[in-house]
Amino acid sequence: MTLVIDPEQNEVRALRRVADWRGKRVIEIGCGDGRLTLRLARLGALVTAIDPDAKLIRAARKKLPERFAKRVRYRVGSAERLDHADESYDLAVFAWVL
């Protein structure tokens, strides 16, 4: 018997269970190379993706397909120094940042 576990599909299923992402304004803290950012955009979220590492932000921008460019904004920064008004976002995502 062969057992195949697809971690990407498991992650997408988990995201779908958490919320209806369509049209939601989402801030992703610690976006890294943008792997999760792309998943959120595919689910319909409007994502502001933040990471303190400028190299990772550049890599994330390069990986993002053009069709999602209007759904995602990348910023170099940290959670401690957000310059966004209260209630700017519907949801916040922190994944793999600790």
Residue ranges and their predicted role:
Residues 5-24:
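Conserved alpha-helix/loop element of class I SAM-dependent methyltransferases that forms part
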Residues 6-10, 30, 74:
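Short gly/ser/thr-rich secondary-structure transition/capping motifs
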Residues 20-21, 41, 86:
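A short, aliphatic-rich alpha-helical micro-motif
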Residues 24-32:
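Conserved class I S-adenosyl-L-methionine
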Residues 25, 46, 73, 88-90:
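Structural signature of beta-strand start/N-cap positions in the alpha/beta core
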Residues 33-81:
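Class I SAM-dependent methyltransferase SAM/SAH-binding core
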Residues 80-91:
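A short acidic, Gly/Pro-enriched loop at the edge of an enzyme's catalytic core
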Residues 90-98:
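A short SAM/SAH-binding and catalytic strip from SAM-dependent methyltransferases
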